[in-house]
Amino acid sequence: MMTSLQKKILVLFIFSIIIIIWILYNDSTITQPNDSTIIQPNKSTITQPIFASNTTKNTGFNDRGGGNTIFLDRHNLNCDSNGINSFILVNDEKGNMRYDYNCSSGGNLQKLSDKDTGFNSDGGGNIIYLDRHNIDCGSNSALAQFNLIRNNNNQLRYNYKCLSSNEPLYCRNMTTTPGKATGKTSDLKTQNLSCNNDEVISSFKLTRPTNDSIAYQYKCCKY
């Protein structure tokens, strides 16, 4: 027969064995984190807005009026809720002209706002007087529409519309190749303002690099 002391020792031994087994079991079922189970953020899974140039438009041919600047008021370049990607003035052999232009798609643009450059002399129809007009949508904005208008006081201005972006835009300054300045609208046919397919125009201005040449300075912007 076991004494009471021996019984107590046996109970403690059995209880110790049970505790050890319980600890070993639970330790083996704990999942430790490792590199293969941790999901790291990946740029490829983050959707960023982008522009894509995929719509070609034109303003339709209309009389170029012997090259007088005021005849540009017949042409309205309008991309509606998208940004303008490029534009150039085109002449035909019948004394007509039109603007060809591309509209972007995509992006994260909204809040259309109306702007103008303010009236200034039309210079008797000389194209170089357009250098007094700076079409500028400002930072984080895209140009969506513009047209030249005139009043009854021999003055011109650009009306234009801008779209603000919900995401920051990164811009670069561009300049067209200078072309000969004769004072006629036909001078603009050498001035091709064109951004990459993932960019939009945010500003442009006619300049005179020399007394007998013109060029456009403009900005191309993207996400």
Which sequence ranges carry the predicted segments?
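Lectin-type carbohydrate-recognition ectodomains
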Residues: T47-Y223
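Compositionally biased low-complexity segments enriched in polar/charged residues
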Residues: M1-Q6, N26-K57, D63
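Short linear motifs centered on Gly/Pro in flexible linkers and helix caps
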Residues: I23, I30-T31, I38, T69, ...
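Single-pass alpha-helical membrane anchors
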Residues: T3-D27
